[in-house]
Regions:
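Extracellular glycan-interacting surfaces
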Residues: 1-350
């Protein structure tokens, strides 16, 4: 197991549910310690990043831009970020240059730093047409970089499908037409907050690419997991119902160490009391239940250690539940956040 590994949880309020002051932000605990520390207070936090080459540097995506720590999360300072009050929902480190980091925002914008997150600039707006209405602005929920074409980026949008860039984020192309076509199938129709039954397919939460199958882009959305092998022109249902009784896809991540391993967080719905983490060791062809715990809320996030494959952590909504394994899934430990903290959105470790 990697030494001096910290665990981080990002907490925010659920849409339409007021939160009490002090119950949001970033919590930190050492992997061998039972106590959580509230290290960033008052700012709702939807995304976390432990820098993969320097774990001293930790990023929090908040409702007021990017906050940065250079002491393993003991303290945070607001980065030199160009916009006030901008919600940050995702981060991506460029595999070619660890100094370059992307941040995805709501309303949709992409920001980039070329100095390890000290300062940021807003890239040209992607200009993707909104295809569904929602009680919130569209969010850039996750970004991923192609393993062998590093200028090729993909982003999962909530609620607006997928977009692709071929020039390191300067311009973007809509990749959602086939997701909308798939929504014509009875089992893939879903409408909760908008006037289109394509809403469920456009409800993108996460996106990943495994190095073992670099031309397969995997999307986690409300209707399950979907796969594209032609840069987002077409999508195929990965039929997660064959492997899991619940199929609401909230997170999908590729292992940093194993080229063929993927992890997916599946639950019943955005607001639910059950869920599980599934692992594929063949680049998404087959899946098996990985965790050995009972959650009481939707699993919102899977946190993978940058260098230690045995460490995996999950965070579930509503009861401040964090669970972790440090032995590759053989045993699991409950690590609940202090009450009344509830709505976990992100977990990370390193």
């Amino acid at each position: 197991m990697a030494k001096r590994s910290n665990i981080y949880a990002g907490v925010a309020g659920y849409v339409g549910r007021p939160e009490e002051k002090g119950n949001v932000g970033v919590f930190r605990r050492a992997a061998a310690d039972a106590a959580w520390q509230h290290v960033l207070t008052d700012l709702e936090t939807h995304a976390l990043l432990v820098h993969p080459t320097d774990p001293e540097v930790v990023f929090a995506g908040t409702v007021d831009g990017v906050w940065r720590s250079t002491d393993r999360g003991a303290t945070f300072q607001r980065a030199r970020f160009p916009d006030q009050g901008k919600q940050i929902w995702s981060f991506l480190v460029d595999a070619r240059d660890p100094r370059r980091i992307y941040a995805g925002a709501s309303p949709v914008d992409i920001y980039r730093s070329d100095d390890r997150g000290e300062s940021w600039r807003r890239l040209p707006n992607p200009g993707i047409k909104d295809r569904a209405t929602a009680p919130f602005a569209v969010r850039v929920m996750r970004m991923v970089q192609h393993p062998t074409r590093p200028d090729e980026l993909y982003a999962a949008l909530e609620v607006n499908g997928v977009m692709r860039s071929g020039d390191a984020g300067e311009t973007w192309t809509d990749c959602s037409a086939d997701l909308i076509r798939l929504s014509e199938r009875p089992n893939l129709r879903s409408k909760i907050v908008s006037d289109t039954y394509a809403e469920g397919m456009l409800d993108g939460h996460a996106i990943a690419i495994s190095a073992g199958d670099p031309d397969a882009v995997v999307l986690a959305c409300r209707m399950g997991l979907f796969r594209s092998t032609d840069r987002g022109q077409s999508w195929q249902d990965m039929e997660m119902h064959k492997f899991s009784p619940v199929t609401y896809g909230r997170d999908v991540r590729a292992s940093p160490q194993d080229a063929s391993t993927l992890y997916a967080a599946l639950s019943v719905a955005a607001a639910s009391t059950d869920g599980g983490v599934y692992r594929s060791q063949d680049a998404g062809k087959t899946w098996k239940r990985f965790d050995k715990v009972q959650v009481h809320g939707t699993i919102m996030s899977v946190g993978l250690h940058p260098t230690d494959p045995d460490q995996v952590y999950i965070g579930a909504r509503y009861k401040g539940e964090v669970f972790g394994t440090q032995d590759g899934g053989a045993t699991w430990e409950a690590m609940p956040l202090p009450e009344p903290v509830k709505d976990i959105y992100a977990v990370a470790c390193g």
